[in-house]
Amino acid sequence: GMLVWGSNGNEAQHSFYQWLRDGTGSTSIDLIWSEMPGHRYAEHYRVLLANARAQAEALVARDPKGPYFNAVSTIVLDAVTPRRLGAVMAMYEHKTTMLGTLYNINPFDQPGVEAYKKNMFSLLGKPETN
């Protein structure tokens, strides 16, 4: 199935990214980074950027003899600004809506979330709130 999800590279490296690289299917992966750090810790940024680039290469470089491959796209921002971050968020909102239409899924209907809330309030002995 289709999944639109993300995580920080360092936190996801030993779980989600490993599943993407070594899993049993092909997938499309987007990695996003900025060419300009949003802080003054140059060495920290240098390591994070190297991590992102190495992760991109590792996600593409699956066993060439195997039946699966990953298509990895990198979105490189020149800097993280409210405008650029908003544009990236809008792009993924649009992607989620379009994929929902393509797969005949309503991404705005969340019966699982509603069921969770109903169960949680019941366990807490509280009435449901809207």
Where are these regions (language model features)?
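A SIS-like phosphosugar-recognition module
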Residues: 1-130
